[in-house]
Amino acid sequence: MISSKVAPGEEEQGESPSKVELGEAEEQREAPLEGQLEAVPLDEAGPSWTTGPPLERLPPLGQEAPPPRRCHTNCLEAPLSRGFQRFGATVGANPWLFLLGPALLTASLGTGLIFLPKEKENLEEQYTPIGSPAKAERRFVQGHFSTNDTYRFSASRTSSETNFASILVVSLANSLLEPEIFKEVSKLDQAVQALKVVQENGTQILYQEVCAKYKTLCVPPNPLLFSWQHNSSLNLSDLTFPIHNTPTQLIYLAGFFGGNVLGQMTGKSQRLVESRAMRLLYYLKTEDPEDSERSQAWLTHFLDHFNDMKSSLTLEEIEVVYFSSLSRQLEFEATSKTVIPLFHLAYILIILFAVVSCSRLDCIRNKMCVAVFGVFSVAMSVVSGFGLMLHLGVPFVIIVANSPFLILGVGVDDMFIMISAWQKTSLSESIRERLSNSYSKVAVSITITTITNVLAFYTGITSSFRSVQYFCIYTGTTLLFCYFYSITCFGAVMALDGKREVAWSRWLEKPDQKYSSLKKSCCVPFGSLIDKHGEDNHPMNLFFRDYFGPFLTTSKAKFIVVLLYIFYIISSIYGCFQVQEGLDLRNLASDDSYITPYFNVEEDYFSDYGPRVMVIVTESVNYWDNDVRQKLDKCMTQFEENEYVDKNLTEFWLEAYMQYMNSSGNNPNDKNTFMNNIAGFLQFFPIFTYDINISSSNEITSSRGFIQIVDVSSSSNKKRMLLKLRSIAENCEVPLMVYNQAFIYFDQYAAIIENTVRNVMIASTAMFIVSLLLIPHPVCSLWVTFAIASVIVGVTGFMAFWNVNLDSISMINLVICIGFSFDFSAHISYAFVSSTEPSVNKKSIEALYLLGYPVLQSAISTIIGVCVLSAAKAYIFRTFFKIMFLVMFFGAAHGLIFIPVFLTFF
């Protein structure tokens, strides 16, 4: 990412052009023996990652040597620096080899892009925890209980999501409990059921053919609407909620009506005074694969023609929104198409930034073309990394589409560092020497930052979310290619451009009557010849040395910085307790998707009642034993007394069976009597057939009941509800299990914090170890750890203020945060502790002078790389920008403001 620039005085001093031909070495230096240090004049050495602190002068003979200033542990860094020095010389001597080799490798690996997935992405597999309890619970339910959607369908008894279409109707008046509004809703219902699909072979698919049925009729989309359609005299002003009693049946209204105003109690229900919204649910056949395929064809037709159908009905009393079991998948796949145009914009912006950053008025030292190729080399790394992963069969998920934007911003940082080091070399040296010197100064630093960032990503492989795993694998691998191409083909391009510098310099110095001095002055400002001793300091470096650094080290500025940090950390900690957990499934679609208003209406009017949860007796127990029944009844009571359960809506076959046995005068405590009467009971209550699993040996191996969940609109309530219900089941004396298909997604709320903390701890530990091994000063490791923790707290806290949930997508960014925090803090703190300045304030100023601009440049380039995602219409892309902006902003603030000030206090 970023690297320390060479210190002032590190520029190689060349001789005048009259003594030495350009492009040739001043003189042949004697190479140091293996293991020896090459002598460097004291005034030419400064702190850098590759040279360490300046060498000490030997004391005069007879005087005691002063104590060393600090511990210096460059046992790994020094050999790496020497190795890169040799490698740079090799690249400089063979530029075409190192240019064409990576190009051929990219072309070869790029063939893997033909394996980009063309099939649907499984949302459950990618965005729910691996090995979650709910998935094991589902396997148990599927293995012990059956359903029948062609004869006796029950939505609460299904173990996985069925095919369905859903319409939410909202009254424009205060209440829809009026005959006129019911007529309009009935007209809408009839139009939906009249939809038919004409297939290519001419056959038709009718709703009545694919609907889930109870006996011979399609399951009603709304039980009250169905009753009113068959009995228009039904008094809509005399209803009770959540269950309405009629002389012939009980009508279950919970979940079908929302925005209710309730009156006085009537038994276990309350009078329904007003209701603002109604739900219509059209369940379709799912169990048989052929039936499911036909159902999905009907649903596709429903989605394609619903808006036209709605317009033709001219609905005046109601507003409607719609959704289907296919919608989430289809809309999620559509979001990937919205981000493709942003790739082009991102590359244009980065190229412009690179050109501006690398342009010089001096046409010899100008590196605009080199910068453009640097961006191109980043694109090569994306092609190579993605191609390799696809060749290896690593799944490409949509969230991976964020990766190229990040790689683009990160990759050009290495380019800036290498160009900066090259500009510090002398034109009097050979190309081989110049590249060797450049590599020795920056390649180790680039290596360290690459290792830390790649380690941060690869720790994401330990996540329980496959989408996080795949994103981290793709991005970490691509970063390795980005690093490899930087030190090979980009270095080769710098070497080739160095030959251009030499050729142009010779042309400018050559007396030629055909070229006027005016033309020469256009290439060399003010007509001066090129400086062979290296480029002068960049104006931004001077800004940090002469203005920003001295200002930041004043007493008033330090006081303000401390207050600012206190405000920052308090706000961040407060935000950490406000952040919402889990991925809201509506966020998988684009902002202008039709499912967004559907979920908004559902949240506004239907959040009071959640799913019906199965309470499953997982083993064979003696139901005829009164003690066992009491234990089971005690557990059911504990469920009903939970704040998230409506105790009046419990459904359990055993309770109904005990009433049946008592009314018939049979003894429920006798095993034979208990078992022999179940068949007769099921004839009266056939729906319970699917709740009792009786083996061939006439033994109840498992059974289930149902409880109604309420008040779980927020992710925190869903998490607490899930954990509480499982705790009750686990502590029950009878072996119990709770399950609903929604738990598959609810499990992410329980797993996300655990996964985030684990990944952050693993990555932070890895960063700490790397800093101890590769940064030659132990004190730096402490400041690196402090900065990582501080930035993570800040990013997490401010996520809440920016309406970003802690989910699998933001968890990726928190892992990224660790790598960037390391980069920003490690360079500044090391430059500080390595400084030879006499006072802490001057040490801080020198650190900012050497590294302030690289830190700022790194942050800006990365933000530019991802800023185009802010224009995306999809949450998963926009969130990536938000968190990366926070990471860059807070990381740069720590590197440029907080750490330089805090270091002066110790």
Curated annotation (Swiss-Prot):
Keywords: Cell membrane, Cell projection, Cilium, Endoplasmic reticulum, Flagellum, Glycoprotein, Membrane, Transmembrane, Transmembrane helix. The keyword NAD does not apply. One of its GO terms (cellular component) is sperm midpiece. Expressed in germ cells of the testis (at protein level). Pfam families: Patched (PF02460). It is found in: Cell projection, Cilium, Flagellum membrane; Endoplasmic reticulum membrane. Glycans are attached at residues 148, 235. The chain crosses the membrane at residues 338-358, 370-390, 392-412, 442-462, 476-496, 559-579, 760-780, 782-802, 814-834, 848-868, 883-903. Its main location: membrane. Residues 339-496 form the SSD domain. May play a role in sperm development or sperm function. However, does not appear to have an essential role in spermatogenesis or male fertility. This is Patched domain-containing protein 3. It comes from Mus musculus.
